[in-house]
Curated annotation (Swiss-Prot):
Keywords: ATP-binding, Cytoplasm, Cytoskeleton, Hydrolase, Nucleotide-binding
Role played: Actins are highly conserved proteins that are involved in various types of cell motility and are ubiquitously expressed in all eukaryotic cells. Essential component of cell cytoskeleton; plays an important role in cytoplasmic streaming, cell shape determination, cell division, organelle movement and extension growth.
Full protein name: Actin-1
Superkingdom, taxonomy of origin: Eukaryota
GO molecular function, one term: hydrolase activity
Cross-referenced Pfam families: Actin
The reaction(s) this protein catalyses: ATP + H2O = ADP + phosphate + H(+)
EC number(s) on file: 3.6.4.-
Localization terms from the record: Cytoplasm, Cytoskeleton
Length: 45
């Protein structure tokens, strides 16, 4: 899984999930629907 304990640990797999979600589930073009990704301020680096 690309997320461990709420933190993205594998960005390549996470991008594949986003690609599938935008194109196959939502059926929208990601360049027309921006997403703001944030992280908690106390996440470990």
């Amino acid at each position: 899984y690309p997320i461990e304990h709420g933190i993205v640990s594998n960005w390549d797999d996470m991008e594949k999930i986003w690609h599938h979600t935008f194109y196959n589930e939502l059926r929208v073009a990601p360049e027309e629907h921006p997403v703001l990704l944030t992280e908690a301020p106390l996440n470990p680096k």
